Swiss-Prot record:
Organism encoding this protein: Heyndrickxia coagulans (Weizmannia coagulans)
Official protein name in the record: Anti-sigma F factor
Coiled coil: none
Enzyme Commission number(s): 2.7.11.1
Protein family according to the UniProt entry: Belongs to the anti-sigma-factor family.
Key words, A-Z: ATP-binding, Kinase, Nucleotide-binding, Serine/threonine-protein kinase, Sporulation, Transferase
GO biological process: asexual sporulation; negative regulation of sporulation resulting in formation of a cellular spore; sporulation resulting in formation of a cellular spore
Keyword Nucleotide-binding: yes
Gene Ontology molecular function, alphabetical: ATP binding; protein serine kinase activity; protein serine/threonine kinase activity; sigma factor antagonist activity
Lineage, top ranks: Bacteria, Bacillati, Bacillota, Bacilli, Bacillales
UniProt cross-references to InterPro entries, sorted A to Z: Anti-sigma-factor_SerPK (IPR050267), Anti-sigma_F (IPR010194), HATPase_C_sf (IPR036890)
Record's function text: Binds to sigma F and blocks its ability to form an RNA polymerase holoenzyme (E-sigma F). Phosphorylates SpoIIAA on a serine residue. This phosphorylation may enable SpoIIAA to act as an anti-anti-sigma factor that counteracts SpoIIAB and thus releases sigma F from inhibition.
Amino acid sequence: MKNKMQLQFTARSRNESFARVRVAAFVAQLDPTLDELTGNQTVVSEAVTNAIIHGYEENPDGMVYVSAAICDDGTVEITVRDEGKGIADIEEARQPSFTTKPELERAGMGFTIMENFMDDVEIQSQQESGTIIRLKKHLALKNALCN
């Protein structure tokens, strides 16, 4: 049985911190280490920021959907979805330093950062239909807080 949560919000940069904090609060029930918690916050920030900046090109009318689940074995699954313009070439986009917006700070590092913090990163995208990023990380269970 999975414990689940869902969020949806408009594609505004200020909502990135909202998503990050909500997912961190949800994952906190596993009593993660500070590194694990920070890693989860970082990947949510990167995925949501990608949806806002690249998916919707900062059009605040778009919606971003975030869900998180905690599996019985302690695996955390996070999904970030948008209905934006999609990614033309996923393999190219996953290359370190590849960017379509070189003028931005840290441009091109989003997927690399996600891959460094998570056990599994899956990206599905269709042009003009949006992108789904699925992130998985196994956290060690601490029995006192999981029951």
